[in-house]
UniProtKB/Swiss-Prot annotation:
Sequence positions that bind Mg(2+) 2: D11, D136
Transmembrane residue ranges: none
A GO CC term assigned to this protein in UniProt: cytoplasm
Gene: rnhA
Primary location: cytoplasm
Co-factor note (free text): Binds 1 Mg(2+) ion per subunit. May bind a second metal ion at a regulatory site, or after substrate binding.
InterPro entries on file: RNase_H (IPR050092), RNaseH-like_sf (IPR012337), RNaseH_domain (IPR002156), RNaseH_sf (IPR036397), RNaseHI (IPR022892)
EC number: 3.1.26.4
Gene Ontology molecular functions: magnesium ion binding; nucleic acid binding; RNA-DNA hybrid ribonuclease activity
Family, as annotated: Belongs to the RNase H family.
Record note on quaternary structure: Monomer.
The protein, known as: Ribonuclease H
Amino acid sequence: MTMKNVQAFTDGSCLGNPGPGGWAAVLRCNGSERELSGGFALTTNNRMEILAVIEALALLKEPCGVDLYTDSQYVRNAVEKKWLAGWRRNGWKTSDKKPVKNRDLWERLQPLLDLHQVRFHWVRGHSGHPENERCDVLARTQASSRGLPPDTGYRE
């Protein structure tokens, strides 16, 4: 049985950093498209970037080949440059022995990366890439919403 191939486009936004934030993803598979987004009252841009990837991958109910497009060097580098593996190996400490930021989200992301075959593609933000621009609009709309829930994992 062959694995489904999915295109996932993700973005995170924060109005202030920290401040109200939003995340968004657009997924495409076999000619169909799905948009998803959410937000939090107080969070950071990096948390929203990671969460967008988590939510996109979590939507997939079976192992898939995923071409994931992000404008976040932070997320891409954490995976591709093996920072994530190093942090786990070092007891969630950075190379200078400080606690890894956003550990709660990295721990949610890892099993999804193990399940799917994810290929990261970096796109320049705000450069006219249609899907990245769409995700940006969705994420900013969420960040601007009233009555957002707290980001319980955020620590100042």
